[in-house]
């Protein structure tokens, strides 16, 4: 078993935001391999985030993003369980990153799939079925279903990879949220947003 140094624990904490004991355990389980420990903590923190999902979120922050050309702006509300986390730098940075993403992607209309009204889904499904009318009958429904899934990814926030792919390693907003939730030990919820664009 590899000797775990305080410097390794600090580096892992800085990279993941996990607690000291979690970092020590992850390093011990991976024989001091930092990269493997990061992966292990992501898995564990993700599981922890799932367990936090049912807790009430009565605190949070509203953050704004105004594009440098002053033609697009976004307000976003991100909620959590305590005012302590609402003031946390990582939490506030996440809310700002979400606002920036929404500003960059004009197709977003809803936070998640659950918010898309059934009548809107039905209307889109009918359009996709008509577009596939010339295909064999046995594949029409699958084509329409695939197009609906792709459309939902375009119009809902949480399933989209963040526009800053380099910083977030191509992760979706939901994956980033789940990691943050696990890191902070609280439920983190993107509640709502408003996007404003000149001339839109």
Model-identified regions with their sequence ranges:
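N-terminal assembly/interaction segments in proteins that build large macromolecular machines
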Residues: 2-200
């Amino acid at each position: 078993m590899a000797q775990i140094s305080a410097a390794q624990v600090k580096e892992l904490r800085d990279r993941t935001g996990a607690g000291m004991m979690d970092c020590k355990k992850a390093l011990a389980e991976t024989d001091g391999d930092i990269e493997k420990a990061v992966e292990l903590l992501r898995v564990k923190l993700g599981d922890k985030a799932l367990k936090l999902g049912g807790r009430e979120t009565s605190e949070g922050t509203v953050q704004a993003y105004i594009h440098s050309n002053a033609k697009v702006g976004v307000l976003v509300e991100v909620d959590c369980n305590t005012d302590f986390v609402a003031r946390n730098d990582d939490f506030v940075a996440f809310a700002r990153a979400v606002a920036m993403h929404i500003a960059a992607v004009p197709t977003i209309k809803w936070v998640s799939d659950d918010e898309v009204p059934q009548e809107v889904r039905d209307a889109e499904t009918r359009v996709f079925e008509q577009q596939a009318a010339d295909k064999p009958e046995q594949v029409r429904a699958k084509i329409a279903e695939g197009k609906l899934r792709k459309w939902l990814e375009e119009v809902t926030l949480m399933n989209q990879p963040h526009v800053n792919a380099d910083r977030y390693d191509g992760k979706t907003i939901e994956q980033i949220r789940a990691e943050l939730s696990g890191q902070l030990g609280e439920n983190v919820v993107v509640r709502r947003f408003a996007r404003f664009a000149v001339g839109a």
